């Protein structure tokens, strides 16, 4: 197991104990183990990270996933963060196209190609490529789909954090986009900010919404993008074709607009001030429109009614999205009274028995146990290490250190128990966690006993980044403690 990089195929053929030992070394702060795990999803030079080592996403490069993983590791893998930033700028939308949902300034959702560095992708991945291209468009041997609302503000936020840590020289780098045009990174980031501003200004709620342009596109265009990702409390699907404002996306929009002002991306000081003022409007509208006083929790989002498109409805499902809002500055910048009103109840709910499991946070509260007949991709019988870690970061940001440590420990212990970096874990309504999904472990209970219909992807990029970030934070804490005594 020497070396800095482990091909995904070799990882799959390792024994459980071999994989577990690499994860164990990672948690001890072994940088060789960091590189070995990160090497599972490192794409060809210049392409950042593949989404996973699994059959569905092993040759897919997602904007959101790559940006969030890069942000997790920005303090100790700045080279990767820079690569992701430049790739997103390279693929940034330039024209308006309903089929691919491309818009000027918009950051991509999913990029696929039939070849990388003259190597053809496997046949199974080619089949996925052609199936998606038939509905989303494609240019010959490449496919770039833009059906996501959150990748664009996340991109701006990532650039802002990179500049804060490493200086603004990166803004002067020249990127050649996929059509051969040359622009500075600063120009690309400014175009992304203008996309955010335009969409917030045009929203009746003055929030950042998604609404698909292509009826074959993803109906829900935030990270919970499955068909049951956004359900009302009575089980009715949120109306995807009427515009939806998702709660956590408003945190990204707020951070991006604040970053735009700090980076001075406006043509003058008045425009920079406008970015900051618009962020405040997003903050006020989020707290005013989405808070459910009777539940002492934020709604999952807002949608319209198909019967009355002018009417606003709260998506009153109790979901993890509200806790993910903690990992932004939107709530952090409130006054003390507002913080007490909003933050403490959210923390109490997310750390309570309706959400907390041995593997992390359920994506939907047990209050909605009957919302679906089986364990849906983003429901109450799954926990995603990515979401659990995002919530842990938010808890730490707001001073809930013990709670953050608890969640990080659940992410770490689940990786050790499973000897894998899974996309999610199935957790039944009694709290039993299924840690193994591989056919070579016949002693494990079958997936249907947990109400699931599919296996999680192994080697998920943002599960790996979460584990590495947890390991690195612990390593630095040990180092600082040692040198302080």
Predicted regions and their residues:
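Extended glycan-interaction surfaces of carbohydrate-active proteins
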Residues: 7-61, 87-140, 201-244, 284-383, ...
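Alpha-helical support elements that line or immediately flank enzyme active sites
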Residues: 65-95, 320-334, 388-401
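Extended acidic/polar, glycine-enriched regions
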Residues: 1-2
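Core register positions within helices of long alpha-helical scaffolds
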Residues: 72, 158, 256-259, 263, ...
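Extended, well-ordered alpha-helical scaffold segments
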Residues: 14, 19-30, 77-91, 169-199, ...
């Amino acid at each position: 197991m020497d070396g800095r990089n482990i091909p995904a195929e070799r990882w799959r053929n390792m024994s459980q104990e071999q994989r577990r030992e690499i994860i164990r070394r990672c948690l001890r702060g072994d940088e060789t183990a960091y590189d070995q795990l990160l090497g599972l999803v490192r794409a060809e030079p210049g392409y950042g990270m593949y989404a996973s080592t699994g059959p569905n996403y092993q040759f897919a490069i997602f904007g959101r996933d790559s940006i969030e993983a890069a942000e997790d590791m920005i303090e100790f893998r700045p080279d990767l963060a820079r690569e992701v930033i430049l790739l997103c700028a390279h693929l940034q939308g330039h024209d308006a196209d309903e089929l691919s949902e491309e818009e000027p300034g918009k950051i991509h959702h999913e990029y696929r190609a039939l070849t990388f560095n003259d190597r053809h992708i496997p046949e199974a991945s080619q089949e996925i490529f052609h199936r998606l291209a038939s509905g989303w468009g494609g240019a010959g041997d490449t496919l770039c789909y833009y059906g996501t609302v959150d990748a664009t503000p996340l991109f701006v936020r990532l650039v802002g954090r990179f500049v804060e840590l490493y200086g603004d020289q990166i803004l002067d780098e020249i990127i050649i986009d996929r059509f051969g045009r040359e622009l500075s990174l600063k120009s690309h980031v400014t175009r992304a900010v203008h996309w955010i501003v335009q969409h917030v200004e045009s929203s009746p709620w003055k929030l950042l919404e998604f609404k698909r342009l292509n009826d074959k596109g993803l109906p829900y265009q935030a990270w919970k993008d499955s068909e049951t990702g956004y359900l009302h409390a009575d089980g009715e699907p949120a109306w995807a074709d009427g515009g939806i404002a998702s709660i956590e996306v408003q945190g990204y929009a707020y951070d991006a607009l604040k970053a735009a002002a700090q980076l001075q991306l406006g043509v003058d000081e008045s425009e920079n001030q406008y970015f900051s003022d618009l962020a405040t409007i997003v903050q006020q509208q989020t707290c005013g429109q989405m808070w459910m006083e009777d539940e002492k929790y934020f709604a999952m989002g807002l949608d319209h009614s198909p019967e009355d498109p002018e009417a606003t409805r709260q998506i009153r499902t109790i979901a993890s999205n509200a806790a993910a809002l903690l990992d932004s500055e939107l709530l952090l910048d409130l006054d003390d009274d507002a913080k007490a009103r909003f933050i403490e109840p959210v923390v109490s709910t997310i750390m309570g028995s309706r959400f907390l499991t041995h593997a992390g946070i359920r994506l939907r509260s047990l209050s909605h146990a009957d919302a679906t007949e089986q364990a849906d991709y983003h429901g109450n019988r799954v926990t995603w290490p990515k979401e659990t870690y995002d919530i842990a970061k938010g808890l730490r940001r707001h001073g809930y250190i013990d709670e953050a440590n608890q969640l990080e420990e659940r992410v770490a212990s689940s990786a050790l128990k499973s000897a894998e970096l899974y996309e999610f874990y199935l957790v039944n309504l009694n709290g039993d966690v299924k840690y193994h999904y591989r056919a070579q472990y016949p002693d494990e209970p079958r997936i249907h006993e947990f109400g699931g219909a599919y296996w999680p992807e192994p080697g998920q990029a943002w599960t790996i980044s979460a584990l590495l970030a947890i390991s690195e934070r612990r390593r630095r804490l040990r180092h600082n403690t040692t040198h302080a005594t």
